[in-house]
């Protein structure tokens, strides 16, 4: 899948495994140099002090190597010697070598050398060495076969080492070694017996193959990249550990190492072959719901609990998609009984704490993050902003609440009330925020002159909208040179002087989540041909470039002809690193929109 001579390497995508905190990435500045880190703290590999250079040793000296990685293991080879690293979901990874050794050398990404190390020491029972790395946790090093050396060098009077190096070396008689490195916070986690290394590699591959079964087949021509996308999601999937009460899916492993609340529902949408897992994925953030207000929290990491703030009420949109594709039998009566109060409280939070003061359920946002579109031109006139794209999410959430109520044992009588509220809010949005060409956001009753793609996001309401609005939205989205580019829909009109392809998210670049939302919406509205065409443009480009979040459609700005701003890598922004968010958006389009 990834490697020195493969189509994609590990410069933009990091190598990881479901349920493992360890990742491996190739150094952008020193090509061919692999680096090992963990995502306990959520710190980016660009800045983390906890990064180890991985060096292949021949006769005890580092040599240049090539590498290949698949879900089973990552293998490095040079001059007849090879070393493989296999990750596990049991808080350790294994290293196996033949005619070569392996060195892990601590080197901060911020120029702090080995500062992350608080001490390296042999354990009294003789089982191995332990390293204390402060907020990054601990590592336990054990030679199963072969040998290893631990080297720490301190400057005179220094409290932290200048050098931390662990060398795993082959047995002199066999030329082989087998080792384990455990990754944990405070105390070594029980792991059982070490299995045969090749058995572990096959188990990893099987785990990935089983995970892939939750997805429908990709449309013809998209199968190869769909496998990469599935691997991306699988490798970002946590186990229940640290702050995570259940498995979550991280945005990225090496860059943005956090679980975002609305992204959990994005990840659920393409899981059409296992809707019960999709339902669990949608419900997972309700584990941390504020019982007093009903608010769902913001992002969280392994070591940091959910943050304040919030993201959009995306759960209704995700459920609406699942209901259209597979029905609602995956929600049992017991599920509905348990989740109705939680979903209802989430909907009421928006109406109570973000009410626009217009005498109804209309809401006004206080932050762009509440729409999901962090730098969107919808919000250029300030706040509070009545934003139809967020209102559309709330409408679908209300309908989902109604449906869950109907399936419950005790709340079925609430179904009609929620549907009435959803319908009234839909009509109010159409009456007040459709200007004949687009939906508009408003600040203090005045329309915001924005050319954001988000103006058309209410198409997610599908056939709840009048046909003339559906037709107009489809027309606007399929007119070349406005939002439609050769590679999909740009997040800001190409005619807008606010469009930028530099360090931006949704102010010009062609972004996966927006393209997915709009194509799913067009499909729901009966515009399958238009949805198919846009999705193919986006996914065809992903096939060529890899699973990054946003692409620059051109190298110049159409509104003035000037050279476009550039993103300078490496960085965690949408134009560089691979992410599960781009992967799940791609998977939704190639399994549920294209050719359907």
Describe each PLM feature range.
Residues 162-164, 253, 265-266:
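Short alpha-helical segments and helix-capping/turn motifs at coil-helix boundaries
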Residues 269-273, 317-327, 396-407, 460-463, ...:
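Short glycine/serine- and small hydrophobic-enriched flexible loop segments
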Residues 227, 265, 276-279, 283, ...:
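A structural signal for well-ordered alpha-helical segments within the folded catalytic domains
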Residues 218-256, 281-302, 355-385, 424-510, ...:
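Extended glycan-interaction surfaces of carbohydrate-active proteins
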Residues 166-194, 253, 297-314, 328-331, ...:
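The feature captures the catalytic groove of carbohydrate-active enzymes
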Residues 257-288, 454-466, 515-528, 538:
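Alpha-helical support elements that line or immediately flank enzyme active sites
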Residues 1-221, 273, 524-525, 576-582, ...:
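Terminal accessory carbohydrate-recognition/targeting modules of carbohydrate-active enzymes
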Residues 200, 204, 221-228, 274-287, ...:
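Extended, well-ordered alpha-helical scaffold segments
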